[in-house]
Structure formats: structure tokens, C-alpha cells
Amino acid sequence: MARLSKRLKAISEKVDRTKYYPLQDALNLVRETAIAKFDESIDVAVNLGIDAKKSDQAVRGSVVLPAGTGKTVRVAVFAQGDKAREAAAAGADIVGFEDLAEQIKAGNIEFDVAIASPDAMRVVGQLGQILGPRGLMPNPKVGTVTPDVAGAVKNAKAGQVQYRADKGGIVQCTIGRASFTVDALTQNMMALIDALNKSKPAASKGIYLRKISVSSTMGIGVRVDQTSMR
């Protein structure tokens, strides 16, 4: 505990928690303070000006991060016939239909993303209580229920991430690793912000992007000056 406290104290001394840093300075600071023995993830928290309790102000979607996520993603696809062959050719790790559903019911969930062709939803629908709590349930809003299963597989492999505002109107998303360059993290950050702006509900009034901060897995939040992102 003493070692952890000493580490956090050292990080806190480098970060002025009352200051808003230009984006690249913030990312560089987060990288510098990511001193754990593993490659920490770099995470973004965006406080949105929405009333998340209202269905017409829900914010949810997906975006392909141009510099990737730094993570190897295993993709499972529910499809049959030509769609199954297309998914396999696109690089899906697991392809199946009712047989895949049975594997999942048996507790074999060895994938990070699940994709389904529309006709497969009659099978996938039975798995809601298993996949839902794990954030793996295919959904058309994030592009994981689609007739273009091959395209969805390629996007997932290329670094697609999903985002969703929680009950407090906050979106949290990983945009890379501490080993990424600042330029790579900046590209990913701007792609996420662009996607969030495009997802702005028509019913949202006033300031939409209220506060943005970045942090590493074991670090503390660094506030971002939004004027540096325009």
C-alpha cells in the first residue's frame, strides 16, 4: 500500500488537476505517468450535455479508431450459408449458427466481439441474458447486426470500438495503449469525438461536450482543453 501511495503521489505531483491541458500535452502527460509494469490502456471520459434518462437523448454507436486499439480482437459471427463463408474469409475467428449458440449456452465464450446477420437474430435473441451483461449482444445501432458481416468483421479487426453514455451521461472509451505515440492517440481521440458529435441527439440542448478527460489504467484524470481540438 505504501508503494502504491508513493506512486500515486509522484503522479499527482506532475498533474495539475485544476488545469485544462491542450490535447497533445494531456496525452503526453498521461503517457509519462503510465508507469505500471504492463502496457496501460489510455482511456477517455466525455461528460455529455444530455439527459440520459430520456430515450430520445440516448447516445450509442461505434467508431473505427484509425490507429487501432493495440489489442488483438477475437470475433464471433452468427451466420449461415454464403454469409458464413464471407465472414470466415474476412477473418472471423469463430463462425456458426445454432451450434455457436449452444457453445455459448455451455459457457464457451472465447471472443471479444459478436456479429450477426439479420436472419440469425432468432437464434441470437435467446442469448440475451448471457451476452447482454458482458456487453457482447449484437446490436444494429453499433453495426454488429448487419447483412454485411464481412465488413463488420474487418471493422472489428481494424480497431472498432463501441461507445455508450451511461446513466450520468458519461461516455468512457479506450483509445489505445501507453505504448502508442501521441500522434496515434490524437488520431484516435479525434475520431471518437467526431463520432460523438455525429451522435448528438436532436433533443440535446446547450453545451454538448461538457468535459473531456484522459487517463491511463492506473493513473489519474487529466482535463483536456477543448479549444485545442478545433
From Swiss-Prot:
GO terms for biological process: regulation of translation; translation. Gene3D superfamilies: 3.30.190.20, 3.40.50.790. GO terms for molecular function: rRNA binding; structural constituent of ribosome; tRNA binding. Transmembrane segments: none annotated. Coiled coil: none annotated. HAMAP family: Ribosomal_uL1_B. Part of the 50S ribosomal subunit. This is Large ribosomal subunit protein uL1.
